[in-house]
């Protein structure tokens, strides 16, 4: 597994959860002897929704809502068998989406 690289992409609505999960992954990887590149903050996606408050008239009365999706990227270079086992056993927060790719 010395020539492989593990790329981890994290997505979450709450930046505190994603930063905490990223720190857990980095600590786990470094403890098992792997090199870590990152965390690299990727652009935050902002989705805005406008909703009419009034059911019939007053088109000017509106509410605006926003959902922010925060993203982070981690590269684990030269992972060992211990690194892969430790990452599989790692329990992350429920609000964090994790995508792992080997390359």
UniProtKB/Swiss-Prot annotation:
Q: Supply the SMART domains for this chain.
A: Ribosomal_S10
Q: Which NCBIfam families match?
A: PRK00596.1, rpsJ_bact
Classification via InterPro entries: Ribosomal_uS10, Ribosomal_uS10_CS, Ribosomal_uS10_dom, Ribosomal_uS10_dom_sf
Q: Which SUPFAM superfamilies match?
A: Ribosomal protein S10
Q: Which cysteines are joined by disulfide bonds?
A: none
Q: Please name the Pfam families in this protein's record.
A: Ribosomal_S10
**Which gene is the coding source of this polypeptide chain?**
rpsJ
Molecular function GO terms recorded: structural constituent of ribosome; tRNA binding
PROSITE patterns, per database record? RIBOSOMAL_S10
Q: What is this protein called?
A: Small ribosomal subunit protein uS10
């Amino acid at each position: 597994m010395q020539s492989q690289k593990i790329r981890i992409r994290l997505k979450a609505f709450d930046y505190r959860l994603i930063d905490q999960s990223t720190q857990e992954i980095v600590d786990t990887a470094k403890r098992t002897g792997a090199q870590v590149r990152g965390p690299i903050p990727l652009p935050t996606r902002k989705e805005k929704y406008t909703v009419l408050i009034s059911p019939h008239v007053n088109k000017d009365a509106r509410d605006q809502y926003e959902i922010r999706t925060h993203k982070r990227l981690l590269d684990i270079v030269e992972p060992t068998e211990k690194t892969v086992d430790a990452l599989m056993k790692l329990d992350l927060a429920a609000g964090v989406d994790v995508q792992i790719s080997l390359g």
